[in-house]
Structures are given as structure tokens and as C-alpha cells.
């Protein structure tokens, strides 16, 4: 009897699970980066499947900046309690003491100190030699050329010209002392794949992904939602209630909402089939300087 042919999503799922299992077996101290977004939620679901009925054999790490949406933090804590995984939350203590924030210090400095340097601190503190990330190649041009096994030097820096070939699904995980890798099990997924898989597997998400009436201010052509009293308004700016949702999530002053009526998974998938805009157009950190994402990744960013 001929074997049943796998669907597109089943093939992606099988590939990702194989990568997760291989890294868990090959490396001494792996960790999964958990940003609380939709891609992280899918990656967490895949990790749970990979080791079911056992528990995930490595911790999840959230690099907090102090500026995440309140709904994201509540969702993070609820997921950890529900599934019983080990959750590590790290915030850069020096940046916190200096009061680094996106309003007074700008997006580039805030991202470097609170996210990039914060991540490197946590990786060094716990001695992780492999870190799973939820990046996909269709997101952004610098990520399009990144390998599944993305090698980093002892300072966690990425050199795109010094990476290893990956033939078919054969990965070389040998690293020298002090070096590490970032692993991207979702590399071959698209944004639409992610949403269809979320629908198929009934994966829980932060409610911010779904359209609702929210208080936003228009700034530079982008809609920014006020999540707490720290939100600073420029002269002439005022809040207005709009029906919006978030296509991607990050620090709330640096993440723009979009007009949308998609308040269900079915409507979001329909919206994805029709959209022609970039998923990351709402991430202000991607446009704070030329070739911004690649520069950040070279310095140790996700």
C-alpha cells in the first residue's frame, strides 16, 4: 500500500520538528527564544509536538525590554503556567538603570541596548550554545540569506560571508569553544503558512493580532497604540479610536497597528491572501537606518 502523501503544512511541520530534535540531541545547552509573537507560538507548539508526551527539554528565554504590550506579558505568563515549560526572562540591568527608552534615546539605541545587548547578556550568563529563533526567510532580505544553522562568533556576531553550506537537509553543527549558533526551524515557512498552521492546530495567540477598537495616534504615517501612561505625545497629536490589529508585535512605541476588520483567524487568512504589503512595515526599528536589520544581526540581534 502506497504511503499517504504529506500536505504542504505537514511537510513544513516535519522539517521543523526534525531540526528541533536534531539540535536538542547535538548541542549541550540549547534554548528557545520566545518573543511571544505568532512565530514564537508556532515554534513553541512544534517543540511541544517534537517531545510529546515528555516536556520540552530546554528552557524558553524572553528578552524583555520593559516596553512590551501588557497583553504580551500576560499571555507569556499564562502560556508558561499552562504548558509547564521553564521560562527565563531577562532584562538588561544597565539599560534599566539608565532609563533607556525609545522616546528619549531613539529606536536604534533602545533596540541595541535593551534587545541586542540584553540577549547577549542572557546567552553568556546561562552559557547557551544554540538558540532557536522564529525568523523566516520571507520576512526581510537579510533573513532571506540566513542559514537554518546560523553561526555566531564568540561575541555572538553574524558574518554572512562565513557560513556553512546546507545541502538538502544536512546541517553541520560543529562549533569551536565560545562559538554558538542561532537555529531557525521556520526558515522555509511563509507568513501565510504560519497563519494556516495556527488555524489548523488551533494555536492560542496574543489578542492584539485580532482586530478591535483601540486608542491609537497617527505618527509618521503609522498608527501607534498607547499601552500605558509612559506614551509621549508630540504637539498636535491626539488619540483616536480606530478598528485596528497588529500584524507583528514588539515594543509598543515601535510597533504600528494597521486598519483591519479581521477579528478571526479565517478573516486574517483571507486578508493575507489579498495583501501586497510587507509584514514588517509596522516595525519601526527596521527603518531607523539603511540596511538596518543586517547591521543589527551582525552585532548579535536575533
Swiss-Prot record:
Tell me which UniProt keywords the record has, alphabetically: ATP-binding, Nucleotide-binding, Nucleotidyltransferase, Transferase
Gene designation: cysD
Q: What interactions and quaternary structure are annotated?
A: Heterodimer composed of CysD, the smaller subunit, and CysN.
Q: Which organism is it from?
A: Shewanella baltica (strain OS185)
Top-level class of the enzyme under EC nomenclature = transferase
What is its pathway? Sulfur metabolism; hydrogen sulfide biosynthesis; sulfite from sulfate: step 1/3
- Per the record, the domain of life is Bacteria
**Family assignment from sequence similarity:** Belongs to the PAPS reductase family. CysD subfamily.
- Quote the catalytic activity from the record: sulfate + ATP + H(+) = adenosine 5'-phosphosulfate + diphosphate
**Which Enzyme Commission number(s) are listed?**
2.7.7.4
Gene Ontology biological process terms in this record = hydrogen sulfide biosynthetic process; sulfate assimilation
Q: Give a single Pfam family match.
A: PAPS_reduct
What's the name of the protein?
Answer: Sulfate adenylyltransferase subunit 2
Region Disordered, as annotated, extends over 280-302
GO MF term (any one): sulfate adenylyltransferase (ATP) activity
Its job: With CysN forms the ATP sulfurylase (ATPS) that catalyzes the adenylation of sulfate producing adenosine 5'-phosphosulfate (APS) and diphosphate, the first enzymatic step in sulfur assimilation pathway. APS synthesis involves the formation of a high-energy phosphoric-sulfuric acid anhydride bond driven by GTP hydrolysis by CysN coupled to ATP hydrolysis by CysD.
